[in-house]
Amino acid sequence: MSMGAVRGFRTDEIDEEEMMKARAAYFACGDYLDEIIGDFLALLKRDGLLDDTIVVYTTDHGELAGEHGLFWKNTWHEAACRIPLIFSLPEQRRGELTATEITAPVSLADVFPTLCGLTQT
């Protein structure tokens, strides 16, 4: 059975209440992630490690939460394949380096070489 045949993949296969519950759970996960990242950064700061830490935030895929009439990640729609890739450097946080936004597509395969370049290893 293809993933498209699984009940709940398309929004016309679930009722409005189920869709609202699914969206609420999805957004609650984002809120929780924001909270624990904040807690983690606070611990790094408390322990004097934040000034020597490169923080990288990314994910392996996006998610559809009803956009295009679909749920899950199994499409090439932008919401499923365009993901955050954020590097937070000590120099940026100290105001010594201006943050730059790169809008061109990148790959997660770029993360390791980028970290090696930043740490000169």
Predicted regions and their residues:
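Short alpha-helical functional segments enriched in proximate histidine and acidic residues
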Residues: I36-L43, L64, T114, L118
